[in-house]
A protein has these predicted regions:
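Structured catalytic-domain cores with a bias toward divalent-metal coordination
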Residues: 1-336
Length: 336
């Protein structure tokens, strides 16, 4: 077992800084719409038709600055039940002023429009859109939607932030997941200023993998729970995006709250139930826990025969299940 000091450290702002790329000023074309420097435009990007014949489209906001700079995409609701990012993007795009922007922003608050309508993580065929990238114009619905997003959004950008929440019946501490071995990505992750940033392996078919293959630094922001707005998670997301834009020299803001120190983690573990029963959790999001520290206990339905659940490592609680009814092997507490 590693000592926590080996993989958990404070991240400070005094490391060497990489110079972000700057794209020249000019019209930005998305879905055939031309957005000129100093302008903003909302458009509907046609995606696919429902069985009724109704066309479903991706809502896109393009903000094209008057000065050269990076191009940042913001995306949310790749999983249709993960809603915090929808409001994060609403707040960010409402606040941005094109005449103060260096570079441009392409924001898509709902990528999985089908899942959003059904309040579901998945597409109608039960596929996970975040396992379908980079997609194909001749593949499944998920593959076609991924291909459209890659062509119209990702391929035009220098950086990206994909906004998520925990899956249903779970909740996450605000955190950044990224490839921290890549210096450019590391610096952007640090600039975001989330309570925790995690070196996360790249999953096949994920948007982050597709962006990485194009050498685009991409962050995943995880915070809150499915089908709920969480004000703290939303505000930390908004602040983090503006900090990233300030780091990239895209946008200066004096209204940012001062970021907390970010804890960097290279290892995470889910603590799982050794038996079925009623789960009584004592550990909360953000708690710093010791190795073997009790996180709660499981009883039978009479409240008897308690079994202690302990942390397998030192670290911070970054997520936990919400359902007190557990089966053997269920995920209980996530420690980083």
């Amino acid at each position: 077992m590693k000592n926590s000091k080996d993989y958990l450290k404070r991240v400070t702002a005094d490391s060497p800084r990489l110079i972000p790329p700057k794209l020249p000023v000019g019209p930005l074309v998305v879905g055939g719409a031309e957005v000129f420097p100093g302008k903003r435009q909302k458009l509907d990007l046609p995606a696919a038709r429902l069985p009724t014949g109704t066309m479903l489209s991706l809502p896109v906001t393009i903000i094209n600055g008057k000065k050269p700079g990076p191009r940042l995409w913001l995306s949310a609701a790749i999983h249709g039940d993960e809603l915090n990012g929808v409001d994060i993007i609403r707040r960010v795009t409402k606040a941005l002023k094109p005449h103060r922007l260096s570079g441009s922003v392409i924001a898509v608050p709902v990528v999985n429009i089908f899942g959003l309508l059904e309040q579901s993580r998945y597409l109608p065929d039960r596929r996970d859109l975040n396992r379908a990238f980079p997609g194909s114009t001749r593949g499944s619905l998920a593959s076609r939607l991924a291909s459209l997003f890659m062509k119209e959004v990702v391929s035009q950008c220098t950086h990206g932030i994909d906004l998520h929440t925990a899956a249903i019946h779970r909740v996450n501490l605000p955190q950044i997941r990224a490839n921290l071995e890549d210096p450019a990505t590391y610096d952007v992750a640090r600039a975001f200023g989330a309570p925790v940033m995690i070196h996360a392996s790249i999953r096949d078919g994920s948007l982050r993998q597709a962006a990485t293959k194009r050498n685009i630094p991409a962050l995943v922001y995880e915070a809150g729970e499915a089908l709920r707005f969480d004000e703290e998670a939303i505000q930390k997301g908004v602040d983090g995006i503006f900090r990233v834009m300030a780091y990239l020299e895209m946008y200066a803001s004096t209204a940012l709250s001062h970021p907390l120190d970010t804890q960097e983690s290279r290892e995470t573990r889910w603590v799982r139930a050794s038996r079925g029963g009623i789960w009584h959790r004592s550990a909360n999001l953000g708690d710093v826990v010791r190795h073997r520290q009790p996180l709660g206990f499981i009883t039978d339905t009479f409240g008897d025969k308690p079994v202690q659940v302990r942390s397998p490592m030192e670290g911070v609680v970054i997520g936990h299940g919400q359902n007190p009814l557990v089966n053997q092997g269920d995920a209980l507490v996530h420690v980083a």
